[in-house]
Amino acid sequence: MSQFSCVGLIGRLDSDNAAYSLRRLISFLAKQNIEVMLDEETAEFYTENELEIVSRETLAKRCDLIIVVGGDGSLLSAARAFAGKPVKLLGINRGRLGFLTDISPDEIEYKVGEVLAGKYVSESRFLLHSQLYRGEELISEAVALNDVVMHPGQFIRMIEFELYINDEFVYRQRSDGLIISSPTGATAYALSCGGPIMHPSLDAIVLVPMNPHTLSSRPIVVHGSSRIRLLIAKDNHLSPHITNDGQTHVVTKPGDEVVVTKSPDLLELIHPTDHNFYETCRSKLGWASHTGGC
């Protein structure tokens, strides 16, 4: 008997491979005596089904498990929609790296079957909450599972800004931008810019400069409860962009402030019982395997 009563499905929209895996998953779930629903955005591209098609808001209310078929980008989008909701997320990898979507396509029936039987490990991941202020006015706010990034947008020019942590001045910097990353995002964009790998269970945030003009500027790891504030210098000759998980963005103006804190809403992410963070790092990042001892 399944531990879950209703499963919601979300698929990558531009992938024939994802569509194939989604068909396999639907066929498997049809035999499990479980109510299954399909995300309405996915249904626009995947019409070969007789499932109930609903919004993500409805999925959050009626489902207790969401299965995402796609890459990490697909799961990032789902994470922002379902964080703080009483629903768990499981990922089937039809993307590239797959740090978050860790079930391979050839294991769908076996691994998903184990999860439905209650054989899984669950972990809570925190998200970042970003706010853009223009004077006293709140211009926009968003959440991100991986990272909040300040960057020049379409222009190749340096940004000048000041960094404050818990209202304490840290530095004034000229660089291509700054990556503010959660532990989940530490193996994504932050890693490619020289940031440290952090275990996802850590209550910490890492700030990674992008091509800083000062060689001594290095990534800083701060406590997860920190309030991070960026003051965009008024003499900037461009309007930096703030991007959340590489998927949503807002354009700032010189003199704006960006405040990033830990969101109170947690994401419940589940994995197969054999999930191991360090094994994932070895396989995804190409680390050397054990060869019999030193």
Swiss-Prot record:
It is an enzyme of class 2 (transferase). Involved in the regulation of the intracellular balance of NAD and NADP, and is a key enzyme in the biosynthesis of NADP. Catalyzes specifically the phosphorylation on 2'-hydroxyl of the adenosine moiety of NAD to yield NADP. InterPro entries: ATP-NAD_kinase_N (IPR017438), ATP-NAD_kinase_PpnK-typ_C (IPR017437), NAD/diacylglycerol_kinase_sf (IPR016064), NADK (IPR002504). This is NAD kinase. Its main location: cytoplasm. NAD(+) binds at residues 72-73, 146-147, 157, 174, 176, 187-192, 247. It is found in: Cytoplasm. The active site is at residue 72. GO terms for cellular component: cytoplasm. It comes from Saccharophagus degradans (strain 2-40 / ATCC 43961 / DSM 17024). HAMAP family: NAD_kinase (MF_00361). Its cofactor is a divalent metal cation. One of its GO terms (biological process) is NAD metabolic process. Gene3D superfamilies: Probable inorganic polyphosphate/atp-NAD kinase, domain 1, Probable inorganic polyphosphate/atp-NAD kinase, domain 2.
